[in-house]
C-alpha cells in the first residue's frame, strides 16, 4: 500500500501521503486490505506530513499491529517532496525500537552501490527500496547486489546495453498501451536511459520520431 506518494493530484484526493494527516484512516485502510487477502501486505510511507507532524514511530507501531509484514520508509516528509536530504536517522530510530519487529526498508537518496552499502551498515535497515535512481537505469539493482557480494563495482552499461533496454521497454510499453500510444509515452524515458552520454542529443530527435517497433 502506497501511503508515500507526495504528488499534489494524488494527495488532494486524500490518497498517497495525504493519509498521513489521518493515521486512524491509514490503519483502517490497512486492516481492510490485510483482512481481505491471504497475501502478505506491506506499506510504504513517509516520516510525516511536515517537520512539525513527524509521526513515523506511531505509524510503524500501529501498522504493525494492523498486520503488515514489512514497512518501507521514505525518509522525507510530504512537504519536502524530493527536496533536501532524506533523514535516515529516523529509520535508525525505528530499527532500534524493541517493540517494532517487522522488517524495515529504507528509501530516499540511494543512487549508487557505495551509498547503498554505507546506509545499510550505518542505519541497520533490513533492506532498501530504490525509486528515482532506477528510472532509466535498471542496472542499479544488479550493481548494488554485486557490490554487496564482492566489494567490486560493475562496469557501466554500454550504449548497446542501453539500446537493448530501451527496445525491451518500448516493446512492453507497446504491448500494454498499444504501439502508437506506447511509443509516444516512451518519449519521456529516452533521456533517462542515456543520461550522462554526451552525444545522445544527436540521436534524441530520431528517437522522438519513432512511432513503430520496426523503427528500432
Question: What residue ranges belong to the model's regions?
Answer:
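Alpha/beta catalytic cores of nucleotide-metabolism and tRNA/nucleoside-modifying enzymes
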Residues: 28, 36-38, 52-70, 82, ...
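Active-site mouth loops of central-metabolism enzymes
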Residues: 19, 45-56
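Glycine-rich tight-turn/loop motif centered on a GG-T
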Residues: 8-26, 79-88, 152-153
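N-terminal small/glycine-rich loop or linker at the start of catalytic domains
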Residues: 5-15, 30, 34-42, 47
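Residue-level signal for pocket-adjacent positions within structured domains
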Residues: 5-6, 14-15, 77, 105, ...
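Active-site beta-loop-alpha junctions enriched in small/polar residues
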Residues: 4-6, 44-50, 74-78, 107-111, ...
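Short coil-to-beta-strand
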Residues: 2-3, 63
